[in-house]
Amino acid sequence: MQSTDLGSKESGKIWHRKPSPATRDGIIVNIIHNTSDYLPKVLRFLNVAFDSSGDCLIAGDHHGNIYVFDLCGNRFNLVQRTAQACTALAFNLHRKSEFLVALADYSIKCFDTVTKELVSWMRGHESSVFSISVHGSGRYAITTSSDTAQLWDLDTFQRKRKLNILQSVGIQKVFFLPLSNTILSCFKDNSIFAWECDTLVCKYQLPAPPESSNILYKVFAVTRDGRILAAGGKSNHIHLWCLEAKQLFRIIQMPTKVRAIRHLEFLPDSFDAGSNQVLGVLSQDGIMRFINIQTCKLLFEIGSLDDGISSSVISPHGRYIASIMENGSLNIYSVQTLTKEINKPPPPLVKVIEDLPKKKGNSGDLKVKVTSGRVRRPARSRESKIQTRILKQDLTCGFEKKENELSDGLNKKRLQILLKGYGEFPTKYRMFIWRSLLQLPENQTAFSNLIDKGIHVAFLNLQKKYPIKSRKLLRVLQRTLSALAHWSAIFSDTPYLPLLAFPFVKLFQNNQLICFEVVATLIINWCQHWFEYFPNPPINILSMIENVLAFHDKELLQHFINHDVTSQLYAWPLLETVFSEVLTREEWLKLFDNVFSNHPSFLLMTVVAYNICSRAPLLNCKRKDDFEYFFHHRNNLDISAVIREAYRLLDTTPADIHPDSMLDAFVALTKGQYPVFNQYPKFIVDYQTQERERIRNDELDYLRERQAVEEMQAEVDQQRVEDEAWYQKQELLRRAEETRREILLQEEEKMIQQRQRLAAVRRELKVKEMHLQDAARRRLLQLQQDQREMELRRLDDEIERKVHMRDREIAATAKDLEMRHLELESQKRLYEKNLSRNQEAVAKEMKENADAYRQKVDVEEHMFHRLIGTDQTQNQKIHKLIEENLAKAEQACLNTDWRIQALHKQRCSDLHRNECYQEIAKLLRKNRKKEIEVLNAMMEGEAKKWEEAEEKDFHLKSEKKTAALSDASRRWFLEKEIHDAQHPCDKVVPKGRDEEFASGCLPRASQLNDISEMESLTQISLNQRKMHWDAMEQDLMERVRNLRQRLVTQAQNRCQTPHLLAT
């Protein structure tokens, strides 16, 4: 046997050397699928299907991998990965490359094996699909699940019809019949219907199988011609139905080791024209047995107990069998190899011996060649050399077949001989033998008349006394007992009649006529003299039993007498139940095979034999209860020994006490009408009947009165129930009203909560809106702030530009003054040079005066330089203080601007902001007014200063006139005047600078006037100028102090203005 592992390969060879399957197993190849992981595992195959040619098959594993195996081309290919397990496959569509696969998600998909693409996707099932049946044309398919079956058109892949069923009745299988347009549906209640495919009209329904072999069908198979249906289930029986005659024509019983059938399939043959004779039966042990349904012979089998088969599929031409094993692998079998022993020709009938020509005359050199040849042989026969196994074999099959050919009945003597040889009749023919032995007339009309009288009043309440689980068995027992009571009145009062008839009713429950006639025959023959002492037990019969027991076992009888056990205890229970309480079904049937085959006295002998065979346990019984229990329950006793003992007693009992001398021979029931049965004390029965009738009438009166009372009570109860119902209804209405009110309150609370949630949502939306508005407002404020900052920066830039312009003008003025000073110095030096030239003549004269003058000049120059240094130091201090004040003012402005910006960010309301803007505007206007006033004041101060300058100019002019008079001190004046000319320039320039810093800028003409005025001072005398410059110096310092004070006040006002605006 070759083995192939698919592994991770998507294509390859199935076998690598020519397969040579062994005759014993017929396996061509074993296919397994292991993963190539580090820890490999087996991927189990779940389903397999052949195509219409039978040379290709597809198989799917539980991971959804679907492979195509070409047995002729020795190739396999992976055609699809569905990623989920497949539950059914079909590969015989009219497009040869397409196949159907049912998946675990209840869907059906159609794929192409060549293109490996999805052709269609069909949905509609709500449970797993376990069967796909394709029509012979390949254009229609039926998919079956546990709750529905659906018919699909494979040209359009649309659903045509859907078969719905009740939830209590499940579907076993729905499939197409071959070579026809018929759909066969099999349900879990064993009902089988045939439907027309086009119209879905029910063509016929198969009848129910016989109850003697009633099994629940699980699996089905049909021959290729669609004429025979095989059905099996959880049993070893196989039912064969003829679909043309619509009846069950054969039941095949498999060997006892087969307990359940899991799969059935017919093996096709090319020469049987579709009427397949070989059926493959897969049982629960994993072995698939192939049997001939005509000869019931086992032909061959595949699988074993160690390597069992899970499911199998046979190719359409019958050459291959594909089986999925229980270990998940796939086996391919060769049918030709498996049937090789069966199909081989028989051996030749004639063997020819040929003499060879002699080469030497010596007889020792004689050589004889023996060859076998076939001259002629009979027609080929499978049965000639086949070792057959009969599935169901009866011991007397050939004998009974010969006897059954007699039409007048069986031979009783031969039956007795057969019975003594085997101990019992064959189960298959027991009922037929009993009917022949009892010579039942089968009076259908008479029995129908008895049945038509209905249920006898004595057995109306039979189920109360004998509660039988089976309703059918109870009805049959009731009808049988009623027929007996209508036949003879005594049977309506016989208390043990149900016990007597029950085993026969259970045995013949499907044929009530035979049941009645068997019981009636039993009563007439084997119950003779039972009713003579009615209603007491048959004392005469019991006396016969006691006499026979006394003759054969006195010790046992004495034991019964010692313990006060009478024949009514050790014999009557066995008779009234006809041994059904103490024997099993098989033992009871075996016993009555012998009872019905012998004289009626055999039954009495059987009672004695039962006691004698049970003498050991009976001798150990000491209490009466133990004896009662013993004769009412089954005991460990060999019924064959009891029967043999009964035959011994029948032969060895003396004639004077033998029961057959007092019992009549067997008398059969008359044909047409049943005989009159009056072997009972009629007056007692009539009296009991009259009394019973009277009691019945009294009971009827009582029942009528009780019925009236019950009706009244019922009315009262009904009224009470109605009142109670009304009250309950009112209470329910009240509770419902309360419930509704609570529901309304709850709904109102829910509404309030919803409104609250809605209000919360609205608040959140409002808050979000406010946040958005606030963000927009902040963005607007930021934009305005940015615009303000831009405006402030522009103003700062403008101010800085003006400051730079002012500084440049000041620097240019300073440069002009320096140039003028340099010019004055040059003029001074030129004038001094001229003066020195003029005074060289008188230098000697004035040498002494010059020395004095030089000393005086040195002192005065020292004093004047000290004054200049002091003045310069004071000017520097004033300039530094002004600069510090300006820096402080600018820092205060910056701080004020920062505070204004911070204050603007804290404004949230437009109205408040507008008011602030208005207030700021008002303050700005007031500030502008104040600035105008300050500016006007500064202009007034400047005008006053110009007036003072004019006064000083006038005073200087007068001083010039006076200086012209001081000719004596001209030399000293000139020297002193040079120094005085420098001092006024230094003082006037800071004055101009201070006034220019305070007011913004000064006219250049005023500075030029000051310079021209300082030039005119050279004509003033030294003494007068000294006094005048001292007074002017003091006045100038006072004015500088006032100017500084005003600047400080203005700077403080600028710093306090933002605070006023903020308020």
Curated annotation (Swiss-Prot):
Q: Where are the WD repeats?
A: 33-74, 75-116, 117-157, 158-200, 201-248, 249-296, 297-334
Looking up Pfam families in the UniProt record yields: RabGAP-TBC (PF00566), WD40 (PF00400)
| Domain Rab-GAP TBC residue range list | 424-599
| Stored InterPro entries | Rab-GAP-TBC_dom, Rab-GAP_TBC_sf, TBC1_cilium_biogenesis, WD40/YVTN_repeat-like_dom_sf, WD40_repeat_dom_sf, WD40_rpt
Show the GO MF annotations. Answer: molecular adaptor activity
Share an example GO biological-process annotation for this protein. Answer: cilium assembly
Keywords in alphabetical order: Cell projection, Cilium biogenesis/degradation, Coiled coil, Cytoplasm, Cytoskeleton, Repeat, WD repeat
This chain belongs to which protein, by name?
TBC1 domain family member 31
